[in-house]
Amino acid sequence: MKHILLLVTIFLSNFLVAQTKINGQVIDFDTTIPVAFAKITYESKTFMTDWEGKFSITVSDFKKPVYVAYKGYYEKSSYPVNNGKLFIVKMIMNINVKNNEVYSDQKINLIIKKVYEAQSKNDPEKALTNFQYKNYEYLQISANPDSISGKIDTIQKRNIFGKHKIKLDSSNYRFKKLVEKNHIYQTEKVNLIQQNKKTQKETILGTRMAGFKEPVYEYLGLKLLSYSVYENPFEILETPLQNPISNIGRKLYVYKLIDSVQHQGRKTYRVYFQPKKIRSNRLRGLLHIDAESFAISKAQYRIYGIVNIEATYTFDYLKEHNLWFPKKRKFLVKKGTNNQDLKILGNTIKFNSSSEEKINKNASDRAYLTIESTPFDLKLGDYQQINDPKIKIDLPRSSFNKDEKYWAEFAKDSLDKRKLKTYVSLDSLSTANKIEHKVFLGKKIFNGYIPVSILDIDLRTLIKYNNYEGFRIGLGGVTNSKLSEKYKLGFYGAYGFKDAEFKYGITPSYLLNKKSETWISASYSDDVSELAQTSFVTDSRKFRLYDPRPINISTFYNIKTAALILESKVFPKLNTYFSISQNEIQPLFDYTFVNDGKNYTEYSISSVLLGLQWNPFSNYMNTPLGVIEIEKRHPKFSLQYTQTLPDVIGNDFTFSKIDFKTFYEVPYLSGQKSSILFQGGIAFGDVPLTHLYSVAPNNINKDAILQRITFSGKNSFETMYYNEFFSNKYTSLQLKHTFNKIDLGYKIAPEFSIVTRMAWGEINKENQHLGLAFKSLERGFFESGIEANKIFKGLGLTAFYRYGPNQLAHFDDNLSIKISYFIDLGF
């Protein structure tokens, strides 16, 4: 009997081994992007991976290999292991294959073409003239406690001198204890979406953010994911992507018809899409396409890169309208291949690099962000009266203080015990650490102010340096709403230790209209200004600890200005500025302007100025504190017109100036970004040198390269010397591409950018200007270079080289090496 039992045991063991099921996934070796529909061969059986590169096999002999093949890769043989983990097969790209792109067959191309052509009748936002619905959205940042080790780790670190340092790290233990009790962060909102023939608008009915009595307005305007699957560009994490069902997208993606299935009683095609270049981190996913109407009935998207993103859209079929209407959106963000710190929503979720600590996985790397959005109370056909259609989102104060009973109606998961504890815990933490006040303070500092009682102190006025004034010490500010919401008083005073002169300015203002933020101001100032500087009065103000360009400037002029100013945002996408001013000007260098046979070493100019900034692609939110820009989209356009007043007392010259600027920035999900800055100006009439164009030079007139090492500017020409060129009309173009940080170890992680700048200009009536020798930009000016920013503690290096018709005779005179400095204020 014992022998029989032994034989049965051996037989069953062999049988179970023979039936071992292994789950696996095929990925790219370098990018970790899954390889969809790779060919799997095991024991003469052949099948394909699914659209996420996953597969299952029943292994009978672990000594026999699994063969994997896919176009553009070397064939891979790999032996499965029975360890309960996912069996990963890493494919290596065959660089000898000239064309690694994959292509769609004609049938699926025809289906996608019909989807594109039928958008107008299938996209609810286009097919329905009038509708409204409410939407509940819940955002959560959390982690699975079971995925985190609770052990206290011993970490060995080596400093820059090679010495070892051992320390205990309890961060994983503390993180596990935190997420066992509550989520890391959460926020939720209920909004009303209305649409008529002309526009769509969102009104927030209720909102709450853990740790805040009043929500952070900027978050409520974030567009982390497109509402519509038909939208082009399709947006993920505020990054525009070409939609795979757009006209351009059809040229960038390849499609595969998997099969057809029944979905809500209708035949649908399941179609997989991926980039033609299979290693690209562009969008890929699975579309369910109605076989009759060619509408999207379900969509699943994936992105694999510095973050891994999953997005799922589900729809309900409305039979009476022959339309698929959104049912739910789910969005998941996890850490991807990035080994640098990655921040999402400011500092709220932060994935840390584990390269220094040499541990398998940081606890924070287990964190994930989820968003779930559910429409309800759909009403079709009724005309929707939309107030203020130019405002994209309305945020009334009544939405802030909804009680727990209100939110209980939307609770989807009664088993989530951590949700309520998260609000209680973070509200207490926020109160204890004054987080809400710190956010308020951070916004002020970001704009260059720090609040002190009824005053907002202007941080830009405290200390400056330039070659003319030396150190400039001062104090300035503006009264805030604690004193009055209708009136404000701006002021500053400063003293230059090198020129031994006092400068000052005062600007009282009155609010004419709160809704349009229309202010009327009077201003008087006695100060100095940079020679031939071009500034746009509608540019937004952001705090910079220092402005590097003026440090090396020696040519200034004294200007006493009395002005009346009107500023308004009557149209949300258009900022307007109008002023009439009288200016007394005295150049503080050797200069004479010759006009109509008369020599001027000082002069008066009376003028009007109209400045416009148009942001046609941005969206705006109406908040209790006013209208704010929420979706800062490009391009943006600035236009400025200046006209002197010949018949006004105190005006010596007649001239006009027109200035234009546009900026366009393209972010990529890889973390890289590209930007274009185009700027131009033209001046007509008798224009003194103080009001011509110098095109922002930033190179000092010294012989040796090392003597010219100073701080680099933001958009300045680094190899152009001060006062080298002046123009009465010019154009300039700047192209820039910024790459991801490169981790070199020891906390050294430079962010590289390649930059090319060029400018052309002309000057007429050159003989009117005496005292300064300068050249014309008629033949053009060209420079290119590399920026290695944020190498260590915000410090970096830049190197630029000057070439083209205005190249100088000696090599080192064309070369510019500068120090860059960036401060991360954390918001």
Question: Where is each model-derived feature located?
Answer:
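Conserved "repeat-terminator" motif of extracellular CCP/Sushi domains
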Residues: 87-105
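Hydrophobic beta-strand segments
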Residues: 38-41, 66, 102, 133, ...
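Exposed, low-structure sequence patches enriched in small/polar residues
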Residues: 236-239, 374-376, 380-827
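Short, acidic Ser/Thr/Gly-rich low-complexity loop/linker segments typical of extracellular
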Residues: 45-54
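Short Pro-Gly-centered beta-turn/loop motif in secreted/extracellular proteins
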Residues: 32-35, 56-63
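A short, solvent-exposed loop/turn motif at the edges and junctions
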Residues: 42, 65-78
